[in-house]
Swiss-Prot record:
Its main location: cytoplasm. The keyword Heme does not apply. GO terms for cellular component: Arp2/3 protein complex; cytoplasm; nucleus. The keyword Transmembrane does not apply. Component of the Arp2/3 complex composed of ACTR2/ARP2, ACTR3/ARP3, ARPC1B/p41-ARC, ARPC2/p34-ARC, ARPC3/p21-ARC, ARPC4/p20-ARC and ARPC5/p16-ARC. This is Actin-related protein 2/3 complex subunit 1B. WD repeats lie at residues 6-45, 50-89, 94-135, 140-179, 242-280, 324-367. It comes from Mus musculus. Belongs to the WD repeat ARPC1 family.
Length: 372
């Protein structure tokens, strides 16, 4: 486990480049900062300033090396590196509320933006007119879209929203791709087609994730539940009410294992039993370390004023937390190995810190932990 504190401000979202040498983060404002690793240090190399509202989503396309950002100013920008400068291209999303999340499609020929306008904007580049255009997925979304994730086939899109639903839509754009092959989710996939909708009312859906095979989708909700739907099991849904505070982010690390994190400030493991179609709690992944009590320095006291609105170091303010992160974890991303066999994943949090977790090290540190 490696932890680096970038900022006093919360990190609201992040994205990595292809070779994992650079990370783009939003310091909870209208800017995006790009840091590059140099030895054991992280040095700021770029600042992307074009939004005039808080940046709410970042995604970095690995092959084309383009960054897409969205924000509360209701716009998205596609950033292209020309020389040593990132050049922005405005994408008109045609929404009247804040954009909340953005994701490149696997083939990088389009991206999706979820918003408070109760729509998902599917944006693609129109060669004839030399600009980005978008189509809207509207029905039956009834509230803000908080999270998105793409199926490996580049067509299906999972969305979690504030109307307590996880849905899977077809985002097929005939202008930029061939007709998709049938999937376990369905064979007819015209644009905007609803392929799946969760029936349980479980709270705001903060995070969604497809498995590596694309036949499973997991989501986490504000009532501390974790759910998984398996298309190979006739859309059977496994639900687990966890004992944690609400989880904000989730990702598959194998076909049967999930890592999620949120307001408890540490990642937890969940395991899916394919035969029984059930989810079980696999354990906490952040091993508490016994540390001796000591006095606070003046520097730490001022940092606590910024991070926790308190100069005291008690448990209520987070200094007494035995977790690596001292505030809510806002995002999880797979660093190496992919969703099929993840070997490293990354978390960023509202404490302004970033942690890199090694799966094998976690397995050896936690003797009872077995990641299937």
């Amino acid at each position: 486990m490696a932890y680096h504190s970038f900022l006093v401000e919360p990190i609201s979202c992040h994205a990595w480049n292809k070779d994992r040498t650079q990370i783009a983060i939003c310091p909870n404002n209208h800017e995006v900062h790009i840091y590059e690793k140099s030895g054991a240090k992280w040095n700021k190399v770029h600042e992307l300033k074009e939004h005039n509202g808080q940046v709410t989503g970042i995604d970095w396309a690995p092959e084309s090396n383009r960054i897409v950002t969205c924000g509360t100013d209701r716009n998205a920008y596609v950033w292209t590196l020309k020389g040593r400068t990132w050049k922005p291209t405005l994408v008109i999303l045609r929404i009247n509320r804040a954009a909340r999340c953005v994701r490149w499609a696997p083939n990088e020929n389009k991206f999706a933006v979820g918003s408070g306008s109760r729509v998902i904007s599917i944006c693609y580049f129109e060669q004839e007119n030399d600009w980005w255009v978008c189509k809207h997925i509207k029905k039956p979304i009834r509230s803000t879209v908080l999270s998105l994730d793409w199926h490996p086939n580049n067509v299906l899109l999972a969305a979690g929203s504030c109307d307590f639903k996880c849905r899977i839509f077809s985002a097929y754009i005939k202008e930029v791709e061939e007709r998709p092959a049938p999937t376990p989710w369905g064979s007819k996939m015209p644009f905007g087609e609803l392929m799946f909708e969760s029936s349980s009312s479980c709270g705001w859906v903060h995070g969604v994730c497809f498995s590596a095979s694309g036949s499973r989708v997991a989501w986490v909700s504000h009532d501390s539940t974790v759910c998984l739907v398996d298309a190979d099991k006739k859309m059977a849904v496994a639900t687990l009410a966890s004992e944690t505070l609400p989880l904000l982010a989730v990702t598959f690390i194998t076909e049967n294992s999930l890592v999620a994190a949120g307001h408890d400030c540490f990642p937890v493991l969940f395991t899916y039993d394919n035969a029984a179609v059930t989810l079980s709690f696999g354990g906490r992944l952040d091993v508490p370390k016994q540390s001796s009590q000591r006095g606070m320095t003046a520097r730490e006291r001022f940092q606590n004023l910024d991070k926790k609105a308190s100069s005291e170091g008690g448990a209520a303010t987070g200094a007494g937390l035995d977790s690596l992160h001292k505030n809510s974890v806002s995002q999880i991303s797979v660093l190496s190995g992919g969703k099929a066999k993840c070997s490293q994943f990354c978390t960023t949090g509202m404490d302004g810190g970033m942690s890199i977790w090694d799966v094998k090290s976690l397995e050896s540190a936690l003797k009872d932990l077995k990641i299937k």
